[in-house]
């Protein structure tokens, strides 16, 4: 048995074949940086996969790559991003595989937003807003909390227990900010999803009841932790703002 193992190892070494690892690197189509993950995870995140590039792994694990993300970026391991400018939430796979952007592109562009004062907006909501903003510098343009409606109501805003994080330029328009560049739809989608999933993953420190983004909702008492694409779909309320885009 020992001899058989040695011979097998020698053959693999001489042929240059190395067993791949789950969530490990691989070379995708046309030489693109790839990651060995399940085909379902790959396609859900907008990637494409090829066969026979993750040797030694189960048949459902393929080499997944995504050659376009953000503004002129591509997906690769953060350790291989020469610009050092990476953005999470745009690529398939674990957090170590992110969108690698040019040095002058991507990232947050908003000045620090005004945090609501504790009062009609309750301390729990204010503290949560502070934590979210601190974790996502430059991504939040404005914060809303209290709404002029009776409490209790069907909205936590009426009682000052919910906050809305605005992550595009005003009213959903992608206008130029006077000294902070341009925030486009790609930033809305990237910033929003990153923050929404961060809120889900930090639900305990935020004392979270639920989080809504992109016409989907996640509730810690009802739902399992999962990517935003698997959250429960909500009804169409007729506008970008009402649908929480």
Curated annotation (Swiss-Prot):
Gene Ontology cellular component annotations, sorted alphabetically: extracellular region
Q: Which residues form the signal peptide?
A: 1-19
* Keywords on record: Secreted, Signal
Q: Where in the cell is it found?
A: Secreted
Q: Which domain of life is it from?
A: Eukaryota
Q: What is its main location?
A: secreted
UniProt KW Secreted keyword: yes
Query: What's the protein called, per UniProt?
Result: Uncharacterized secreted protein ARB_07466
């Amino acid at each position: 048995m020992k001899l058989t193992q040695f011979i097998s190892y020698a053959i693999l070494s001489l042929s240059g074949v190395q067993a791949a690892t789950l969530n490990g690197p691989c070379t995708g189509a046309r030489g693109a940086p790839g990651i060995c993950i399940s085909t379902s995870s790959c396609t859900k995140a907008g990637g494409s996969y090829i066969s026979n590039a993750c040797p030694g792994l189960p048949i459902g694990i393929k080499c997944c790559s995504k050659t376009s993300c953000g503004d002129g970026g591509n997906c690769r391991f953060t350790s291989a991003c020469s610009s050092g400018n990476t953005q999470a939430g745009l690529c398939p796979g674990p957090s170590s595989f992110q969108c690698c952007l040019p040095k002058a592109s991507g990232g947050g562009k908003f000045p620090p937003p005004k945090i609501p004062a504790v009062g009609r907006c309750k301390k729990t909501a204010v503290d949560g807003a502070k934590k979210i903003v601190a974790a996502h510098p430059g991504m939040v343009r404005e914060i809303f909390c209290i709404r002029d409606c009776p409490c209790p109501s069907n909205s936590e805003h009426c009682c000052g227990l919910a906050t809305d994080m605005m992550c595009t330029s005003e009213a959903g328009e992608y206008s130029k900010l006077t000294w902070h560049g341009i925030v486009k739809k790609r930033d809305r989608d990237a910033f929003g999803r990153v923050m929404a999933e961060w809120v889900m993953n930090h639900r305990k420190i935020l004392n979270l009841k639920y989080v809504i983004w992109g016409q989907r909702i996640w509730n810690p008492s009802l739902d399992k932790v999962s990517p935003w694409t698997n959250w429960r779909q909500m009804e169409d309320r007729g506008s970008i703002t009402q649908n929480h885009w």
